[in-house]
Amino acid sequence: APMENSTYDYTNYDSLGTLDPSTPVDNTVRRLRPTTIVALVIYMAVFLVGVPGNALVVWVTALEAKRTVNAIWFLNLAVADLLSCLALPILFVSIIQEGHWPFGRAACSVLPSLILLNMYASILLLATISADRFLLVFNPIWCQNTRGAGLAWLACCVAWGLALLLTIPSFLYRKVLQDDYPPKTTCGVDYGHEGVRAERAVAIVRLVVGFLLPLFTLSVCYTFLLLRTWSRNGTRSTKTLKVVVAVVVSFFIFWLPYQVMGMILALLHPSSATFRWAIRLDPLCIALAYVNCCINPIIYVVAGKGFQGQLRKSLPSLLRNVLAEESVIQGSKSFSRSTVDTVADKCQAV
């Protein structure tokens, strides 16, 4: 079996091109591939947009999180994205240095794994938010009696705990490795005696738990939600529903290439032409997955401008409007919110 002791992992940021047979084995300078250069440009854009954007969302939602369920959801999503964005400069430096990793073993285990933690945390949080939307529409009595900030924080803690458990393989298998040709220290994935079997198992679990299962369940959930919304057109606000749907769709769009490439690299033999082709495209797929870390603030701003009908709102005010709980119009009677914990907000906002 190929790569029995040290196998390629498609989250291995330091291995961009090092498995290519054309890689020089002496000390000659090798130029970065075009796909890697494009990936680096994307990383820069993600960092420049994602750090201030998510930090602003964290600031706005943290002020409302004690009393607003929606703010709790969006706060946790922003924290997950912000953690991944903050790790980008170190990963960027490693790629520029052709995979050299001078940051030590602990950083090797943690920093490249943050994108996987982000993936699992984001999809589990989105599933939790979707369940909240579903219950608000189909079980309003339960919401009136039970829904609150305490339960929302508990659900988020469970989501983060599960995400950490699912990221454990990446933490455990990542090690600092010594390359001989050319001599350098790299941060790689070593499956040891388990070899290809472990690599394939990790990739399959990642695909099923992190993509296919959520795609199916959320598709069913939002099909019912949208059908109910359309059948009662004009009876309730759909602001939050539209924002959440946009966030969910963007997640699956930007993570799809990563998941497809991961399965190709896990299942095919390294000597195959398709594998070598996948190695070249892999940096771009990883970069696209990182785009998901900066896209949510953009969605919130675009949605806020659409809902406000004006462009003069300050960003904090605009975000606060988009991410707050909603007032409800039911029939001809308007229920205005004095706080986000009113019965109308709890049981009718979609």
UniProtKB/Swiss-Prot annotation:
The modification Sulfotyrosine is found at residues 10, 13. One of its GO terms (biological process) is positive regulation of epithelial cell proliferation. The modification Phosphoserine is found at residues 314, 317, 327, 332, 334, 338. It is found in: Cell membrane; Cytoplasmic vesicle. This is C5a anaphylatoxin chemotactic receptor 1. It comes from the Eukaryota. Belongs to the G-protein coupled receptor 1 family. Residues 64-68, 132-152, 227-242, 304-350 are cytoplasmic. Sulfation plays a critical role in the association of C5aR with C5a, but no significant role in the ability of the receptor to transduce a signal and mobilize calcium in response to a small peptide agonist. Phosphorylated on serine residues in response to C5a binding, resulting in internalization of the receptor and short-term desensitization to C5a. Residues 1-36, 93-109, 174-200, 266-282 are extracellular. Keywords: Cell membrane, Chemotaxis, Cytoplasmic vesicle, Disulfide bond, G-protein coupled receptor, Glycoprotein, Membrane, Phosphoprotein, Receptor, Sulfation, Transducer, Transmembrane, Transmembrane helix. Glycans are attached at residue 5. Homodimer. May also form higher-order oligomers. Interacts (when phosphorylated) with ARRB1 and ARRB2; the interaction is associated with internalization of C5aR. Disulfide bonds join 108-187. One of its GO terms (molecular function) is complement component C5a receptor activity. The chain crosses the membrane at residues 37-63, 69-92, 110-131, 153-173, 201-226, 243-265, 283-303. GO terms for cellular component: apical part of cell; basolateral plasma membrane; cytoplasmic vesicle. Receptor for the chemotactic and inflammatory peptide anaphylatoxin C5a. The ligand interacts with at least two sites on the receptor: a high-affinity site on the extracellular N-terminus, and a second site in the transmembrane region which activates downstream signaling events. Receptor activation stimulates chemotaxis, granule enzyme release, intracellular calcium release and superoxide anion production.
